[in-house]
């Protein structure tokens, strides 16, 4: 059942991305009518370049924004040995290990592929979790590495950036351009205006949906690695019970953390990069019945 859950999650992500890419293509062709194809292609290249920068430098940016410090085995043998054992178990290269000096319990993984992976845990996380729970959390993070989630999120980020840029340019063209002279009907004008306003919101919602699916997948991958889903479920319950905002908050890297680091509230719930903790725990308990 656990393998089928992992496969189903990957299929869900693929379907979301497939439909999103088709929608982006349709919106792009529609926008090209108003912007001109040469300008449209320029925007696509600009968005792709922006995504590439994010892809290659995402690890360094995450470390800088979080204030994480790189450690060796002697600095924190407990965390280091946990990650090392998981690296051996999964067959992945040993990632760089970091600690974020922050009382808020949390952890994240970043890096464009397993060879450039970085994993980090906050000091608050290390204080409240026992060894099996810590292993469960770090197995979740190694799951992100194994599933190439940074690559997936970069693809989505590039598409969202392209949609945002195209939408902005189309709106400017509609407001300031003389589209009637180009033979565009009033109906076409309204349709393009509608999609230009709606597209960025829809793109953001797709990005959030993909992020939530990858969290479920990392949970399942981590549980399969340790063969002890209850440990991760217990850790998530502790993280929820001891949740507090990080001292160095950044909404741009909120999706990287195992627990949503943003302050609680209506908008956090509405635009969350993470699925509900209760549902994650329920699924992990269901997986636990398989062992």
Curated annotation (Swiss-Prot):
Q: What is this protein called?
A: Protease HtpX homolog
**Which coenzymes or cofactors are required?**
Zn(2+)
List the transmembrane segments. 11-31, 34-54, 155-175, 186-206
Subcellular compartments: Cell membrane
Q: Which domain of life is it from?
A: Bacteria
Main EC class the enzyme belongs to: hydrolase
Coiled coil, from the record: none
Q: Which residues bind Zn(2+)?
A: 140, 144, 215
- Stored CDD domains: M48B_Htpx_like
Membrane-topology annotation of the record: Multi-pass membrane protein
Where it mainly occurs, coarsely classed, is membrane
**Which species is the source of this protein?**
Tropheryma whipplei (strain Twist)
**Record carries keyword Metal-binding:** yes
């Amino acid at each position: 059942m656990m393998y089928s859950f992992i496969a189903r999650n990957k299929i869900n992500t693929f379907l979301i991305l497939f439909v999103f890419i088709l929608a982006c293509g349709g919106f792009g062709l529609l926008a090209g009518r108003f912007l001109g194809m040469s300008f449209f292609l320029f925007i696509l290249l600009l968005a792709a370049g922006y995504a590439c920068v994010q892809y290659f430098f995402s690890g360094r940016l995450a470390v800088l924004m979080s204030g994480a410090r790189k450690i060796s085995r002697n600095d924190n043998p407990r965390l280091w040995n946990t990650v090392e054992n998981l690296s051996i178990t999964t067959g992945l290269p040993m990632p760089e290990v970091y600690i974020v000096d922050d009382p808020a319990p949390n952890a994240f993984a970043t890096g464009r592929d397993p060879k450039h992976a970085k994993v980090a845990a906050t000091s608050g996380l290390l204080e409240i979790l026992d060894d099996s729970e810590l292993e469960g959390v770090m197995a979740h993070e190694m799951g992100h590495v194994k599933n190439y989630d940074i690559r997936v999120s970069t693809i989505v980020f590039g598409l969202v950036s392209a949609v945002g840029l195209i939408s902005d340019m189309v709106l400017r063209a509609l407001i300031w351009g003389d589209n009637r002279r180009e033979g565009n009907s009033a109906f076409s004008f309204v349709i393009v205006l509608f999609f230009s306003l709606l597209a960025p919101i829809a793109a953001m919602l797709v990005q959030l949906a993909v992020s939530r699916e990858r969290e479920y997948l990392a949970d399942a991958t981590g549980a399969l690695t340790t063969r002890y889903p209850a440990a991760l479920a217990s850790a998530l319950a502790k993280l929820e019970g001891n949740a507090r905002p990080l001292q160095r908050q950044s909404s741009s890297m909120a999706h990287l953390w195992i627990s949503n680091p943003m302050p609680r509230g209506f908008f956090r719930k509405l635009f969350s990069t993470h699925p509900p903790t209760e549902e994650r725990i329920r699924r992990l308990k269901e997986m636990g019945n398989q062992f």
